[in-house]
């Protein structure tokens, strides 16, 4: 596995060299930063709800959005969705997720084939027995005709059973057979690589192919992607399938992908969270961004550092202020990205007592150290490492919020440009 040293922030890390793929103008792989993507859970045939969700995901920061294309009505809706999104100013690449009848839907709906930025093919259900290679080839030829990339997405829940059986039988004939788990991992990797080789034989360029091999267990995911990275230079899409709900899904996805990303493996990621009933679908985008930003690979939103609290911080003021600042940042980022270029690099500290508060606040671009239990009811504020004010009274939170807003305007806004 060849690698190069790439620097995001100030931290170099070994980045696996892969072939870059353009997905609707968004580069995946090569020397491009790791791309964040997401998937809708609406009925694609429902144009209004799908447009609304894609727009929300794009506003949240998703750089590519995948939609289900499972029947004629869904395929017919895709061009309408694309057109409506463009009218709303959301020029985000749409990926068509095809299973079982993708070859037929693309052939019957040329406007859908044209509107999509990428096709996802699952080798495990693209076709069965003697129809498998033909139907796979049909989709690849469609991608060539419309100049679209494909993601060959293997999933262990729908793995090619003929391939798995062949490898299991061959393994049993060996003198020292591998475990069933190892054979399963090998089958997943081979399914992706065999399909990629077939696509290239048909005429699809390597710069049009992205691979993924999704499983639901952390150690399996690490093993499978490590094998893929060692045996090919295709761009890789990372994702832990069926990660689950809430903190379990976040922790599992972050643990698996964090290890792979630190090794330089992975060109685009999706955090597959099961949303709670009525939950916000954009949560998966936020988690993906926070994973990449926490590891120092990309910058998306200003970082708010806050202490966890202890017996010295019985007041909830610092917790409420940290939450308010974080929510305010998330809410304003779509506007700030346009108005304040570079604001993503901002760091804010909201600390709860005198022990670490002043020191942490000095390390941030702007920080406040609120009084802990029994401390003098005052809050020093630090800007660029220097103490600039001491806030007192019931309006500390509001005063600090205004100072943050003023700092952003002065550092990233029009005032900075005029001064320079």
Swiss-Prot record:
Reactions it catalyzes = (2E)-4-hydroxy-3-methylbut-2-enyl diphosphate + oxidized [flavodoxin] + H2O + 2 H(+) = 2-C-methyl-D-erythritol 2,4-cyclic diphosphate + reduced [flavodoxin]
Q: Which InterPro entries match?
A: Dihydropteroate_synth-like_sf, IspG_bac, IspG_bac-typ, NO2/SO3_Rdtase_4Fe4S_sf
Enzyme class, spelled out: oxidoreductase
Q: Which GO terms describe its biological process?
A: isopentenyl diphosphate biosynthetic process, methylerythritol 4-phosphate pathway; terpenoid biosynthetic process
Entries under Pfam families matching the protein: GcpE
Annotated EC:
1.17.7.3
Pathway given in the UniProt record: Isoprenoid biosynthesis; isopentenyl diphosphate biosynthesis via DXP pathway; isopentenyl diphosphate from 1-deoxy-D-xylulose 5-phosphate: step 5/6
Could you tell me what the cofactor note in this record states? Answer: Binds 1 [4Fe-4S] cluster.
Q: Does the keyword Disulfide bond apply?
A: no
Q: Which UniProt keywords apply?
A: 4Fe-4S, Iron, Iron-sulfur, Isoprene biosynthesis, Metal-binding, Oxidoreductase
Any GO molecular function: iron ion binding
| Positions contributing to [4Fe-4S] cluster binding | 307, 310, 353, 360
Instruction: Tell me which cofactor or cofactors this protein depends on.
Output: [4Fe-4S] cluster
Functional description taken from the UniProt entry: Converts 2C-methyl-D-erythritol 2,4-cyclodiphosphate (ME-2,4cPP) into 1-hydroxy-2-methyl-2-(E)-butenyl 4-diphosphate.
Q: Which family does it belong to?
A: Belongs to the IspG family.
Give the NCBIfam families listed for this entry. Answer: ispG_gcpE, PRK00366.1
Identification of the protein by name: 4-hydroxy-3-methylbut-2-en-1-yl diphosphate synthase (flavodoxin)
Q: Which organism is it from?
A: Brucella suis biovar 1 (strain 1330)
Highest classification ranks of the organism: Bacteria, Pseudomonadati, Pseudomonadota, Alphaproteobacteria, Hyphomicrobiales
